[in-house]
């Protein structure tokens, strides 16, 4: 069994890997970072015009980082949305993923948060900078190998 998007990608010989279905029947697809920008545009044109969420996670200490996208396509009415989950895995030493800001504007703050917490750089993002942590913060706080500083002084906290 495949989602409509997965079947379309297979038909057009676009490389991806199915990671299975979740409990709601939503398929998760693994896409290579170098293919993500073109597959994002194809997904949008195919009808996945709503980016429900973008997030990131650390797969394992010293392992890969993942950028995750939940896309929705409403073709047969709002009570029957078709959803797909896209995962892009990148090495932690040089975590670069093409930004999808230019496809889904709602990716703006979400990609910035993933950058701020995990250090994933979103190539061609127009304003990629910290959004939650101070600009002076060192490190990526949600990585599993992050060492919490013993003390951090907040300047001008008034």
UniProtKB/Swiss-Prot annotation:
It is a peripheral membrane protein. It catalyses: a plastoquinone + NADH + (n+1) H(+)(in) = a plastoquinol + NAD(+) + n H(+)(out); a plastoquinone + NADPH + (n+1) H(+)(in) = a plastoquinol + NADP(+) + n H(+)(out). Its main location: plastid. Keywords: Chloroplast, Membrane, NAD, NADP, Plastid, Plastoquinone, Quinone, Thylakoid, Translocase, Transport. GO terms for molecular function: NADH dehydrogenase (ubiquinone) activity; quinone binding. GO terms for cellular component: chloroplast thylakoid membrane. InterPro entries: NADH_DH_suC, NADH_quin_OxRdtase_su_C/D-like, NADH_UbQ_OxRdtase_30kDa_su, NADH_UbQ_OxRdtase_CS. Its EC number is 7.1.1.-. One of its GO terms (biological process) is photosynthesis, light reaction. It holds the Pfam family Complex1_30kDa. It is found in: Plastid, Chloroplast thylakoid membrane. It is an enzyme of class 7 (translocase). NDH is composed of at least 16 different subunits, 5 of which are encoded in the nucleus. HAMAP family: NDH1_NuoC. NCBIfam families: PRK12494.1. NDH shuttles electrons from NAD(P)H:plastoquinone, via FMN and iron-sulfur (Fe-S) centers, to quinones in the photosynthetic chain and possibly in a chloroplast respiratory chain. The immediate electron acceptor for the enzyme in this species is believed to be plastoquinone. Couples the redox reaction to proton translocation, and thus conserves the redox energy in a proton gradient. Belongs to the complex I 30 kDa subunit family. This is NAD(P)H-quinone oxidoreductase subunit J, chloroplastic.
